[in-house]
């Protein structure tokens, strides 16, 4: 009888502890777990979610959450992509795909700057292009047009960043997770 009571008490404690989890934490956790499952984050990277999101990491996130996620492993090491990204870089296949698909681009000086921190508007612009939106045809100027469109289709749900603020790894996972259920430019999900 005592064992049954303890088992019941234990199951009630576990059940109650699950109810205390805030909704935002659950959503964030789901986004991060999805990023890990898709290969966008290693388990070590998932442990450092508050670290700034870089352009190289954003390229990896974009590819992982796209139909091209299997192509990254077949890219191989093909020469120098940019002056600061050689073909053997861990981010090289992801950067190559992200640039080829038009989701991201390099700079006029021939660099990509894979270690540069990404701002909210840069990440939203990349996510919108991933979804097929032509960001040059949005109403308004950069970055307001991109941020407004991202907000309208739900990309910014559960993100507290504002214009000009740096994104974290967790923010990047949430943004791309939101892209999974956002309408594409053609109107489909």
Annotate the PLM regions.
Residues 170, 175:
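Surface-exposed binding/hinge segments that line
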Residues 2-31, 36-92, 100-121, 127-166, ...:
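Feature responds to low-complexity, polar/acidic, surface-exposed segments characteristic
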